[in-house]
UniProtKB/Swiss-Prot annotation:
Lineage, top ranks: Bacteria, Pseudomonadati, Pseudomonadota, Gammaproteobacteria, Pasteurellales
Gene from which this protein is expressed: sdhL
Record: residues binding substrate: D103
InterPro entries (alphabetical): Aminoacid_DH-like_N_sf, NAD(P)-bd_dom_sf, Shikimate_DH-bd_N, Shikimate_DH_fam
Protein name: Shikimate dehydrogenase-like protein HI_0607
Record's keyword annotation contains Transferase: no
Assembly information from the UniProt record: Homodimer.
pH dependence, record text: Optimum pH is 8.8.
Length: 271
């Protein structure tokens, strides 16, 4: 029951998603925590952040287009956010606002969890959205043989130069052990919902398929790779792990793997 001691966590986004709201509130309820999570939209990020501070809002998830523009209004930037100059999580400790990027944290942890070979050749397809978090995570995890393939030449070249990698505008004569999709290809409801993020022959010659598209849980890219016995890491794993990292920052509690899976399954029905 909501009362005077209930701690509020929130999200600020141009287009709020139900996933985070449902996921966090499910865990609060199951763990008996006096928290509530609510999504908000805003056009004024400066005053929204001032509101977070002034009203004692415990935590705030930040989505596009505010991940970079919110940074001047925060007190401390964690290395996870410094690594990509982008924030997706704010923690309010008695008026002191600390900023993190749990997307970056999640990808680093998934690289470690799946024991990805640092000597492997990697191709990242895409240069927008999650691309910076993905590329920085691979860079700071010790991967040197990474190339960025993007349809947008300008942003692809910029991202490659930013982290000291090569940009390629074609997959012809290329080969990689780890394939990472950071485009919207395969996304539910998108124009390319049924498409593969990489050519079939390319996937056949790879060892790992990594997709950041969260819905559906299994994109065509992931399904094709699984059918051929490849190691796969789904966007669903990314979105859940980054949300868990947020939850722990807000509450100082880490739910069990079973409860996390339960909350994620429930949240997907509301996505």
């Amino acid at each position: 029951m909501i009362n005077k001691d209930t701690q509020l966590c929130m999200s600020l986004s141009g287009r709020p998603s139900n996933f985070g709201t449902t996921f966090h509130n499910y865990l609060y309820d199951k763990l008996g925590l006096n928290f509530i999570y609510k999504a908000f939209t805003t056009q004024d990020i400066e005053h929204a952040i001032k509101g977070v501070r002034a009203l004692g809002i415990r935590g705030c998830a930040v989505s596009m287009p505010f991940k970079e523009t919110c940074m001047p209004f925060l007190d401390e930037i964690h290395p996870s956010a410094q690594a990509i100059e982008s924030v997706n999580t704010i923690v309010n400790d008695n008026g002191f606002l600390r900023a993190y990027n749990t997307d970056y944290i999640a990808i680093v942890k998934l690289i470690e969890k799946y024991h990805l070979n640092k000597n492997a050749k990697v191709i990242v397809h895409g240069s927008g959205g999650m691309a910076k978090a993905v590329v920085a995570a691979f860079k700071n995890s010790g991967f040197e043989k990474l190339k960025i393939y993007a349809r947008n030449v300008k942003t692809g070249q910029y991202l490659a130069a930013l982290y000291g990698y090569a940009y390629i505008n074609s997959l012809e004569n290329q080969q990689a052990d780890i394939l990472v999709n950071v485009t919207s290809i395969g996304m539910k409801g998108g124009k390319e919902e049924m498409d593969l993020a990489f050519p079939k022959a390319f996937i056949d010659n790879a060892s790992v398929a990594f997709d950041v598209v969260a819905m559906p849980v299994e994109t065509p890219f992931i399904r094709y790779a699984q059918a051929r016995g490849k190691q796969t890491i789904s966007g669903a794993a990314v979105i859940v792990l980054q949300a868990v990292e947020q939850f722990e920052l807000y509450t100082h509690q880490r739910p069990s793997d079973e409860l996390i899976a339960e909350a994620a399954a429930f949240a997907r029905t509301k996505f």
